[in-house]
Amino acid sequence: MIRLLFPIILIPVLAVLVLLPTPQAVAQPPATPKPDDDLVNKVRDSIKRGVKYLKDNQNKSQGNWEGLVLSFVADMEGGTTALVTLALLNCGEKPDDPMMAKALDYLAGLPPRKTYVVGLQNMVFAEARRPKDLPIIQRNADWLIDRALGYQGGAGTLNGWSYPGNNLPDNSNTQYALLGLYAAKQAGAKIEDRHWKAIQDYYTRNQAKLGFWRYHNGGGGDVGASFTMTVAGVCGLYIAGMGLDQSAQQLDPATGVAAACGIYDENDNLHRGLNWIGANFNFDQGKSIAYNVYGIERLGRLSGQRFIGKYDWYREGCKFLVSKQDANGSIKVGAGLDASEILSTAFSLLFLSKGRTPVLISKFAWGEFRDAGGGTFREVSIGPKGEVNWNRKHNDTRHLVDFASRDLFKGVPLSWQVYDMRRQNIENDEKVLEEVGTLLQSPVLYLNGHGKMPFVGLPGSLLTIEEKILQKYVDEGGFILGEACCGDAEFAESFRALMKRLFPDNQLRRLPESHVIWTAFFKDPGLAQFAGLEGLEKGCRTVVVFSPMPLAGYWEEQRFMPKPGKAPAKPGDPLYRGEMAYKLAGNVIAYATGLELPKPKLTTTKLYDPKRDDKGPQRGLFKVAQLNNGEADPAPAAMRNLMTYLRDTTRLDVSLKKLDPNPFPGDERLFGYKFMYLHGRKPINWEGNDLDNVKSNLMTGGLLFADAGCNGFDAWQKFDASFRAMCKKMFPDSPLQVIPANDPLLSAKMNGGTAVASVRCRRERIDGKGPEAEMRNYAPYLEGVKVDGRWVIIYSKYDIGCALEGHKASDCMGHDKESALKIGAAVVLYSLKR
């Protein structure tokens, strides 16, 4: 009797459970964290405490987390252990840690018996990346395909997955079978495209007309509508499409043009499913809130959407889960099925850790759009077969991020997202600043498509909100990658018009052969076939790269992605141009990021609005004069950003206004400014009055802070040599010398209680022939000229100014922004106190 009752009562339950005057600076109390900064810290702490709770509750002798109900009553041995191990791996625990290794070995010893457990096993082994588990991953994938109901290994119609001995499929078992198959695919297992197409067909056949899916397929109207299963259905369509080696776009590998660009069989199904989810969104759904929360994370990550409906899903989910954490570190989100603290904590940590993955690339959504109400949104500008012009390629961004994560960032998990400002009410400049402050968590913004972008204004008209966001994003350190999908001429014309409006003083130009992008990471002569690539220079670096040639079609398909251990394609091979397209993207990303990892999701940057400050009298404010050395305004935002930082972190009254134009060294206005800044890009040729004017200011209490800016290695060497010659000419008896680490300039006393003892910086290679590949932690390296016991010149031969603007470049020898702020603040405070 008991055996009969459990299938009837517990099967739906267990499905959820298992998967479950001179201004003065004075000390200031620590600033109250911004709301988002506070949430970032809370999430970090929550993950740490949750990990400790799970580790403390491991069965140390067996290496597992098995409990009575799931392991014995439900006969799902390994399910809990797999879920917990997956959560710990995603939280950063290493596979070779003895505790983790024991858990992995326990799982490896389990034969395939239940769909849930087998799917989770594969997810764990794919995440752990132990070579010895690869045969198990392939075995499990074959087992899952063999157990698909009605499929007969591909000879029949796939009708989903269920429990052993049960011929009634359910969409929860099916979801975890699919997750296990895709994990196997990612780990290198062989899964034929026909299986993914069968899965696509399964989900499209079983979706209700209203857009939802049920736990069991069948039925009419809205009877049986399930939020968790609809999330699973939409994720299933995404994953099945991602599993295909070759998409249905009908790409010509010789040209990169797709005959069926933007046409996906699942377009309408995805649209209806996402709209239903948006209209019915709630974390508190289904029989297990924890199971639901993890499903929402997966949907957000796979779709790339920051918003599901009108909900900022990760931010809201973090607030919800952090509030549910107990003192012992467990996260208990409810009663009933969520009463298992081990399972609830594991599901919650998967949400917090995977959702927190840094965003490398944001894809910019554009086009006519309508809020249909009730959490549903509709694209208005779509083609006859559902093509959305900004998203003709569904997987290009995902594949680029996967490629960059593996090859450029040594396997560190990274994510992507769609940036869709159309879902928000951004109606003034203050909101623009808030949006850009959030968007800057992603160092690269990807903008591509077909046709004219309707938000691009007419020549001479005021910037649209979209244009303001893009302009401010670049001004604050962001990088734009543009691509004309299929080489679409109308989009290329629209993109060039957009750049003219955003940066009227700068032009898109063909990148020269000498540009570092061609060798930023991959050094392959085959990249020369993309010689038509264009770039826009602004201040310190190239800030926009645009390809009028088709590239996204290659990025859409995994078959073109270079793979470890696989011989590269040779000229004439159909895969050759596609592989080069991936390598080109890798170089652009390496250049744009300087190979520095993005900040965790939720990180925001506080931006300054120049229209709101300095309207009162300027007397008594700390002021900076940035010298003109032949370039009117290099690193124009550097000192503004430094002054804003000082204003916010010390009680220093600063002026955010600039001298306009920047003064030349012989300008008599310099005597009103005792702090001078020189961002060096061109060699210095000061003579006569220029030298005398600056020296007179220095000898009467002034200070010159200078740095060698980002401008290529040869230009850096020339400026550095010229600056040293200038110092010797100005102060022949006071040589430029290294400022010692124990100098008051860098001391804790001078810098609010924390010494400037370590900075992140990219320096020259040991052979002196170029910059290091990556930034490293170093002690600060500053030089100076000292007169009468006071540093009158402080010089960094490694960039400060470009870093203060947030710009990164792989060829730039210099600091990251946080280090530049620390050094700059130390120099300013020194100038006031000496």
Tell me the role of every PLM-derived stretch.
Residues 60, 112-115, 127-130, 150-152, ...:
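Solvent-exposed loop/turn segments at secondary-structure junctions
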Residues 487-587, 593, 601-604, 618-623, ...:
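An acidic, glycine-rich "communication" segment
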Residues 28-49, 64-99, 110-142, 146-197, ...:
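An alpha-helical repeat/solenoid feature that recognizes helix-turn-helix modules
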Residues 7-22:
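Bacterial N-terminal signal peptides
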Residues 86, 121-123, 144, 178-179, ...:
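Structural recognition of the beta-strand scaffold that forms the well-ordered cores
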Residues 357-444, 448-454, 458, 551-552, ...:
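Aromatic-Pro/Gly-enriched surface loop or interdomain linker
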Residues 168-170, 439, 444-492, 675-720:
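Short alpha-beta junction capping motif
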Residues 54-80, 96-113, 417-433, 657-664:
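Internal amphipathic alpha-helical repeat/solenoid segments
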